[in-house]
Amino acid sequence: MYYSPWDCEAYAKNPKYTRPLIQCEYNHTMGNSGGNLKEYWDLIRKYPKFQGGYDWDFVDQGLHRHPDFKANRTVADYDAIAAKYEPGTGNMAPEYTYGGDYNKIDASDNNFNCNGIIGPDRQLNPHAYELAYQYQNIWAEPVDLKAGKISVYNENFFRDLSNYKLVWTLLQDGKAVQNGEVADLNVAPQQRVTLTLPYQVPATGEVMLNVDFQLKDAEPLMTKGQTVAYRQLAVREQTAPAACCAM
């Protein structure tokens, strides 16, 4: 586990190793992590022998509490005629706790319980978006972007792309200037097709092409129109002015 990308590539290229490489852990999603997932998945897609790994871990294991919070309550002594109401006090802001937050001695490895793809409140952490991007099974690649040509690769092994549509947007200096869609994607599993999108490249500025693959009909856990894969391609990159001559 936790082979580096270059160790994984060395294993995949070595003919002495005939068994597939599947890491029992390889992506410790602690803090703002996951920045080298692309390096791993470029190799996974390049070498059939390298077949992936298990992310550590799914969800942060922190516990939800309000620090210094005293709840509303009623109190009474045995001799009291009536109960007394005491309003709650303290900080109402929530926090997520772990390990030594409940003991004088921290028996855990500090904040190692907070290392999930999603947070204790089940909200997505930043690396969840990177993980979803690298795991997507539909890819748009440039062919001749000035002429509107891209290729669409269906990475699925058992299903075609009949339930997806391609939605494209052309941006000039960050602003959408043209858009359209391809309603029918006739791409078989593990196959690639070339499409020509009917846009005109603006004469000036940075030009980017956003490509989204959206569901035509709902599927389990996913809604109609949901984007399940996407790509941004540079039609023309931004050009900086030439540096001034030395003084």
Language-model segment annotations:
Residues 86, 144, 215-217, 247:
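Acidic/polar residues at beta-strand termini and the immediately following turn/coil
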Residues 156, 210, 215, 239-247:
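Beta-strand-rich N-terminal accessory domains
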